[in-house]
Amino acid sequence: MKARQVVAGVHVLLAAVHVYWATGATWPAIDQRSLSQAVLGQEVSFAPQVVLPLAALHVVLAVAVLKVDSLRLARLVVAGLAAGLAVRTAAGLVWDFGLGTDSGTAFYWLNLFFYTPACITLLAVDLRLLRTRQLTELAA
């Protein structure tokens, strides 16, 4: 599977999860407060008006990575993804060292073993896309 398909697939999966949460479902948590604490480390709304725009953003990013018809635009999209992931990775590493989060929370452990490693992996894939000629396929 090509790197850009992996990146797009992750964004489609994230879009689906956000749409799922917009229905009021709280899996993998037992309630919205627990979900918010586990996903974000603080209490925030998972109301449709909050999560549906995020779902739409992930769909737009997935389509842009797969279907953009300009190499320059493709590089800008992937560079934007990489920049966002770099910021999230940096924040995740800070939280991994216990700064700004309590090590007794679900968020701390999810961040340590899932969120930050996932961001590092996606960042590496995005950087690989920027370094290779795979994006030339997007112009065809």
Please place each PLM-identified region on the residue numbering.
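Individual transmembrane alpha-helices with interfacial aromatic-anchor signatures
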Residues: L52, G80, G104-L122
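Loop-to-transmembrane helix junctions at the membrane interface
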Residues: K67-A82
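Transmembrane alpha-helical segments of integral membrane proteins
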Residues: A90-D102
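Interfacial loop at the N-terminal end of multi-pass membrane proteins
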Residues: V17-V51, L99-T105
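N-terminal signal-anchor transmembrane alpha helix
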Residues: R4-A22
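Membrane-water interface at the C-terminal end of transmembrane alpha helices
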Residues: P117-E137
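Hydrophobic alpha-helical membrane segments
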Residues: A79-L93
